[in-house]
Amino acid sequence: MPVVQVSVWAGMSEENKKKVVEGITRVLEELGIPREAVTVIIYEAPKTNWATGGQLHSEKYANR
C-alpha cells in the first residue's frame, strides 16, 4: 500500500522521527488504510545539500 517518503535536515531526533511516523500513519489510518500497510521512509540530508530559491539552507538557516 502507501509508501510515504519524508525528507528532513540531518540531525532530527529519534523521538521526533517517531512523532512524524506516527502522525503520518494516523492520518492514513483515518482514510481507511490499515496501519500495517503504511510504510514511512525518512531521508536525512545535510543543509549543505538542500537549497530553496537558489540559497543553500546551510547559509539561510545557519542558526538552526
PLM feature spans:
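A domain-level signal for the structural core that forms small-molecule/cofactor-binding pockets
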Residues: 2-64
